[in-house]
Amino acid sequence: MSSRSELLLERFAEKIGIGTISFNENRLCSFVIDEIYYISLSDTNDEYMMIYGVCGKFPTDNPNFALEILNANLWFRENGGPYLCYESGAQSLLLALRFPLDDVTPEKLENEIEVVVKSMENLYLVLHNQGITLENEHMKIEEISSNDNKHYYAGR
């Protein structure tokens, strides 16, 4: 029997016209949007799934990085956006958004993925303007249009 996350993922794949996508044996489904944004979905349990945006590796040589990350995390949470978190295996900064599975539609999933993508863009640009660069093979500052963001935006 398929979980609610699996059924939603099937409907989402059909909606966006990509055939089939599925969770792997670790209950993760990862994909790249526009060859820039690396997104992972986690089938955590039958109540919610997690949407992760992989922002890049922690820059260990910038003393302001930790303060900027704390500031960004507070800003995102105050505005209903994703949490910032650390993934130790890849030594990377992630944006994580909890997505409840009650009354879900593929459109709602798409909207929440967009919230994570917009938050990734904004975080990347604000950090870049502070002289902080996250090492990320997918996301390049030149590929994201900017109006010199100086403040965080939760993407909603």
From Swiss-Prot:
It comes from Citrobacter freundii. This is Tir chaperone. GO terms for biological process: protein secretion by the type III secretion system. The keyword Iron does not apply. Gene3D superfamilies: 1.10.287.390, 3.30.1460.10. It is found in: Cytoplasm. The gene is cesT. The lineage of its organism: Bacteria, Pseudomonadati, Pseudomonadota, Gammaproteobacteria, Enterobacterales. GO terms for cellular component: cytoplasm. Keywords: Chaperone, Cytoplasm, Virulence. Chaperone for the type III secretion of Tir. Probably stabilizes the protein, prevents inappropriate protein-proteininteractions and aids in secretion. The keyword Disulfide bond does not apply. Pfam families: CesT. It comes from the Bacteria. Belongs to the CesT/SycH chaperone family.
